[in-house]
């Protein structure tokens, strides 16, 4: 796991190339289940009407949209460090009649004041950050004490037979299909390798502990361990 050390500029360039077909690739490869995972994160966060929410690494805005449906008049801001990924996001929100602010920002250097948000989230982005502990500190900084930092991320399946089947799929089939759908096979090879290497379960909670920013940390398992949702209560 210590070998996983992504280079931010390489990651930014990779996502800029896949951006135009990102949603299509997600829907095909997950059979749409990623939408259910995001809905579960919003519910698990305890977000309520009127809350202020920051979604980091928002990409094309899916999680920001889910939060806005819940918080209503509360403000939702979606950020990403890759400008190309953000291009479809405002249109997707507008189609749904939702008012969401989208801005370019780096999760390790957020431009927002301390204690600005009730909930801060990141989905499928923390493993792409060069210093995830710094990102976890920064997300906590902009979240009020008692607020929640939510992380949705891929991990490793720890169910014997299902794990073997999923590993075969992710190593041998997922990159090929991703390459066909988006024209960027390398991005889906990276997805598989980074998901297999990045800390999950207690390993990720250790990163949260290392940040020193949380009074309580917990997680739930999704789809047998393909992904996990982590929740940290900010000190």
Swiss-Prot record:
Pathway: Quinol/quinone metabolism; menaquinone biosynthesis; menaquinol from 1,4-dihydroxy-2-naphthoate: step 2/2; Cofactor biosynthesis; ubiquinone biosynthesis. It is an enzyme of class 2 (transferase). It holds the Pfam family Ubie_methyltran. S-adenosyl-L-methionine binds at residues 60, 80, 106-107, 123. GO terms for molecular function: 2-methoxy-6-polyprenyl-1,4-benzoquinol methyltransferase activity; demethylmenaquinone methyltransferase activity. One of its GO terms (biological process) is methylation. Transmembrane segments: none annotated. Its EC number is 2.1.1.163, 2.1.1.201. It catalyses: a 2-demethylmenaquinol + S-adenosyl-L-methionine = a menaquinol + S-adenosyl-L-homocysteine + H(+); a 2-methoxy-6-(all-trans-polyprenyl)benzene-1,4-diol + S-adenosyl-L-methionine = a 5-methoxy-2-methyl-3-(all-trans-polyprenyl)benzene-1,4-diol + S-adenosyl-L-homocysteine + H(+). Methyltransferase required for the conversion of demethylmenaquinol (DMKH2) to menaquinol (MKH2) and the conversion of 2-polyprenyl-6-methoxy-1,4-benzoquinol (DDMQH2) to 2-polyprenyl-3-methyl-6-methoxy-1,4-benzoquinol (DMQH2). Belongs to the class I-like SAM-binding methyltransferase superfamily. MenG/UbiE family. PANTHER family: 2-METHOXY-6-POLYPRENYL-1,4-BENZOQUINOL METHYLASE, MITOCHONDRIAL (PTHR43591:SF24), METHYLTRANSFERASE (PTHR43591). This is Ubiquinone/menaquinone biosynthesis C-methyltransferase UbiE.
């Amino acid at each position: 796991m210590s070998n996983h050390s992504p280079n931010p500029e390489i990651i930014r360039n990779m996502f800029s190339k896949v951006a135009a077909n990102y949603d299509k690739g997600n829907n095909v490869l997950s059979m749409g289940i990623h939408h259910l995972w995001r809905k579960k994160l919003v519910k698990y966060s305890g977000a309520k009407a009127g809350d202020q929410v920051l979604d980091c690494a928002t990409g094309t805005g899916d999680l920001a949209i889910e939060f806005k449906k819940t918080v209503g008049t509360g403000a939702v801001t979606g950020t990403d460090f890759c400008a190309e990924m953000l291009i479809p996001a405002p249109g997707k929100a507008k189609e749904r009649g939702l008012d969401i602010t989208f801005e370019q920002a780096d999760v390790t250097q957020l431009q927002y004041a301390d204690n600005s948000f009730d909930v801060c989230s990141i989905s499928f982005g923390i493993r792409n950050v060069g210093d995830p502990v710094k990102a976890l500190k920064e997300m906590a900084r902009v979240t009020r004490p008692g607020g929640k930092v939510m992380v949705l991320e891929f991990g490793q399946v720890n169910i014997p037979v299902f794990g073997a089947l999923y590993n075969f799929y992710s190593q041998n089939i997922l990159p090929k299909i991703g390459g066909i759908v988006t024209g960027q096979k390398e991005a889906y090879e990276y997805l598989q390798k980074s998901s297999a290497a990045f800390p999950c379960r207690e390993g990720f909670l250790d990163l949260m502990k290392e940040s020193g920013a949380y009074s309580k940390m917990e997680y739930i398992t999704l789809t047998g361990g393909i992904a996990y949702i982590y929740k940290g209560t900010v000190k």
